Amino acid sequence: MTFSSHTKDILFSEINRMDLERDNFSKRPGLDFSRNRKLGFKDLIRFQISMQSGSVNHELMKYFCYHKDTPTLSAFYQQRRKLSDDVFQTLFYRFNSHYPPICYKNKYLLLACDGSSFSFTRNPKDLDSYYDPNGRSVNGFNQIHLVALFNLLSQRYLDAQIQPIRKKNEFLALSNLIDRFDPPPGTSPIFIADRGFHSYNVFAHAIEKGAYFLIRAKDVNTKRLLGNDFPDTDSFDVTVNRILTRTQSKKKHRHPLLEDQYRCICKAVTFSYLPDDSDAEYPISLRVLRFPIGEDSFENVITNLPEKEFPSMEIKSLYGMRWGIETSFRK
């Protein structure tokens, strides 16, 4: 059996398994999908994941081999409304569970995170995703933003967050992906991301999860983080200790001798581990690296990977692997 056939068999077996548990994936258990219909639970799932770029009517005709009794568009919409919101997420997780991850150094999971926007069926009533007519579209269009988690060595997507384009928040998306990722026993995830994901809140979520991160940062953010500790060299590898707080009052700081380490997180900025009106403090230790990637160009990365096990050249190599998720979007 070819790999593609084996993969398809696994996918269909999981759909069949969910069909036996369809009450768990129905909005009205015991009522929805209780009658025999041409477009039952199993075919409804298979049809939607096999759809291509044609109209729904045309895709229905293809799926049912142009049979005269092909379900109508209305029938499809009626059946689709019966599905629970988590049905495809559950199928995605169950399907992935059949493929053990490939680890780096027999322990680490290299998980790249990146976002991309996609247009979908025009609906001006969906204000969270709709753009008015402009130079890109005379009729307007709708978009969603997807932030995906991709295993660089296994070449598989493991999870994703979908947001309406007008509520796009990549910091929140990555924090949620970190929180709900459940690594296999004996493994540790390394979340690798581009500079759009650089934030104290993302760093803290990974640390609280017992995970590692490797995230690129702009020059201005690196200098703001390091402050007066920013080395005047083209490359460096330094550890920075910071104490995060919600208050700007030095009188409320618990460690006056470490005043230069304090950074105030204003109320407008999300930080999950400091309530808005709290005097609490959150110490955080970060490793900041800068290395050349060309004659006059450099990269800055922030990580919590241990220096003894991950020297600077290895960090550079690991970050370079992040491009695997960029190319995966185009495959």
Predicted regions: what they are:
Residues 59-65:
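Short alpha-helical "recognition helix" segments of helix-turn-helix
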Residues 109-111:
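Conserved beta-strand elements of the Class I
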Residues 66, 100-101, 179-182:
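Short, flexible, glycine/charge-rich loop motifs used to bind or transfer phosphoryl groups or to couple energy/partner
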Residues 133-134:
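Small-residue-rich alpha-helical segments with characteristic i,i+4
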